[in-house]
Amino acid sequence: MSTTAVERPASRGATEARRRRVVGLGALVAVLMVGAVASLAVGARALSPAEVWQGLFAAPDPDRRLTEIRLIVQTVRVPRTVLAIVAGVALGIGGALIQGYTRNPIADTGLLGVNSGASFAVVTGIAVFGFTSPFQYVWFAFLGAAAAGVVVFGLSSIGRGAGNPLTLALAGQGVTVFLAAMTTAIALSDLKSLNALRFWNAGSVAGVGFDVIGPVSVFIAAGVVLALITLPSLNLLDLGDDVARGLGVNIALSRTVGIVAITLLAGAATAACGPIAFLGLMVAHVARHLTGPDYRWLVPYAGLLGAVVLLVCDIVGRLVVRPGELDPGVVVALLGAPFFAALVRRGKFRSA
């Protein structure tokens, strides 16, 4: 058998795999668009597609009914939908990256302490500085998340085992426990902080305007760019540090850029929405099942899946207790816990 005869089936197989992945990305984009339209229509007051269109594009009109529809769509549901998509992309990509860099199949973005850092910053801002609005404490939350990520990375980079994924995980766990204890102590001593933290911790995309979404999206976009830059080296790191080093990868630089990307993505999303557990863990596993271990495909899939899942969970939360609402962070946790248990039971953990 000639070499050419062997190469042709392999080439056809690679082409077919690429075609399936492209089709899959297109399907996810289509599902996301349908979900966005549904998100604009579903709520305490259901809107028809025609009313959604009017709410988006109709010119200002003295008609009270049309004015009410415009207010619902443009002021409430459009920002909510955009934030669900942006935060879902950030948490999905962050989940895929953290599993890759730690080679830990059950790692989530909370491993870097960003959730506990953001929570600590929120209660500090409310209790010490008297912050009352999301626009005020969202920036404190982002700074807290970023600071926690820096501390975790710094602790994991010194002493014996520096740069080891296990050291990173242990440092993250230590910082998380410490900040969680501090957060609880402050919240229990200040009723206003406790009430604000209780609602923020549920994980919600409601009540946040474009004055917050716009700046947060800039940090998320920066994180996405850094994530895309690291994908080739992340594929090589997946083969092991020694192999990657032999192929010319600057391991320290790659991990540093990756951790910065994860901190930007998870920190900004958590600051805007509150902590949303299990999302990054779930979508990274689903993306790996659909695409295989190639991070050039896995990361885009994880981002789109994160957006779809968070958007769908937000819609479900509006429907199940209508006319009330269930925060999407709660719905994601209700889905994520059984998913995690199923992974454990079936032994589906694969090295990231």
Over which residues does each language-model region extend?
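Alpha-helical transmembrane segments in inner-membrane proteins
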Residues: 2-352
